Each structure stands twice: as C-alpha cells, then as structure tokens.
Amino acid sequence: QSINNNNRRKRIVKNAYIPSRGIRKIPHLSTLLPEFHICKDGKGAEAVVGWGLRPTTHKARAFAAEHQLPFIALEDGFLRSVGLGVAGYPPYSIVYDDIGIYYDTTRPSRLEQLILAADTMPSETLAQAQQAMDFILQHHLSKYNHAPELSDDHPLRSPSKPETVLIIDQTFGDMAIQYGGADASTFELMFQTALNENPQADIWVKTHPDVLCGKKQGYLTQLAQQHRVHLLAEDINPISLLQNVDKVYCV
C-alpha cells in the first residue's frame, strides 16, 4: 500500500516552469508548492508560474499561451510573515490561483469561486473556516505580524474621544489598485467623501507599512495634512486599530 501511495504522489507532481529568478529564490518554495517540481527552463513543463499580474509575468504568460499550458498566479499570502517583505522577511504562505488572481476585477479568480461555492461546502469546511477567523481575531494576526498593539495612552483609546473614522491608504501603483478599477482619483474621492459624511468626527489616515519604512509612496499622505485629519504614521497592529474606531473607509 505504501508503494502505491508513493507512486501516486509521483504521478500528481507536475513540472512547473518558473522564469522568474526572484520567485525561485523564495525560501522553502518547494514546501509552499508541494504539487510541483520547480524548473528554471520550459523543457517538459506542465504548468507555468508567475507573480500575480506584474508586468514581469509577460514572459511566463506568453510561454504558457504559446504552449497551451496552465498559468498559475502567485501572491503574498494573507497571513504572510513576521515582518515586512520589503525588509527581507520570507513568506510563510502564498496565494495560489489557477484561474486569475483575487484583486483582478476583470476576470474570475479561485478565491471568488470558493466564496461563491460557500453554500455547498461541507459543514466541516465551514466550521474550520469559522475557527480560523476566530483564531485570527483572538491572536490579532495580520499579513506581516510585526506591529505592536495600539498603546494604552494612544488618543484612539481615550473613552472621551469623539466619533472616529479610519481611512486606509495603499501603496502608490499597487497592482490591486490598477486591476481593482481604481486610481489616485478614487483615493481622493474616498477621502473627501469621508470628510463630508462625517463632519463632526475625528479622521485618521492609516499609512501602509511599506510607506512607513520608506520603501514606497502612498496616495493620501499629502491630503492628510488638513484640519481634523490625523496621520497614523506608526506601525500598529491592524486588528487592534480596527477595534478602536467607529467607521472605516477603504478602496
């Protein structure tokens, strides 16, 4: 029986052509993609792997189309690491999508299909999902898991604070913005809408962690320098932050 199982495992492992040297250098990539044998050339490839919708995937996508091979899109996992990727911290998870990618609104994605099929999933799967969500909230898990809790003396923890509105910024030029049907004007509209809809509230703008560490630019940094608008320019655990505001705006 063990021999048959080993043979079965060998048959389901496919040769995956990954043109990107950067992807191939991801630590423990073979563990994250156990169903693939990773190849740096296209000979004998049964699938092609690239990173999301970055322009650098053009070569990989063209090769997949030319040879009629499935293309697998990867992205950072939603619970990625214990530090920023731009600071060199390796991923502990990745998103794997054989249909599209979750932030692309122009086509379906595997995540979208899973969500649409939620009503038909086994009760055990739904229970496991609920358990995972509860675990995330209980332990304040996030994408990078490096930021401290909101401090006890932070104004957002004050029991006498006014209604509080949080606006979420993003890194400039992020693929999720472009393929999510948004641009810089969308962020400006969101910002002005938040101000207009909440005239008596304190407005807080949360800067993206990659902007805080100086690696990237944001959309709202300059807009945030206005009356009754506060810029959260420090690392804060996102769940800790969300638990201390009344309303959230995001693109």
Which sequence ranges carry the predicted segments?
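A donor-sugar binding/catalytic signature common to diverse glycosyltransferases
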Residues: 50-62, 75, 234-251
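Catalytic donor nucleotide-activated moiety binding site of glycosyltransferases and closely related
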Residues: 191-233
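N-terminal pre-catalytic "stem/leader" segment of glycosyltransferase-like enzymes
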Residues: 6-61, 172-174
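Short, well-ordered alpha-helix to beta-strand connector turns
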Residues: 44-47, 68, 244-246
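Functional cation/ligand-contacting sites centered on basic and imidazole/sulfhydryl donors
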Residues: 21-22, 168-171, 182, 201-207
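A nucleotide-sugar donor-handling region in carbohydrate enzymes
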Residues: 83-180
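Well-ordered, non-membrane alpha-helical segments in soluble/globular domains
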Residues: 57-58, 182-193
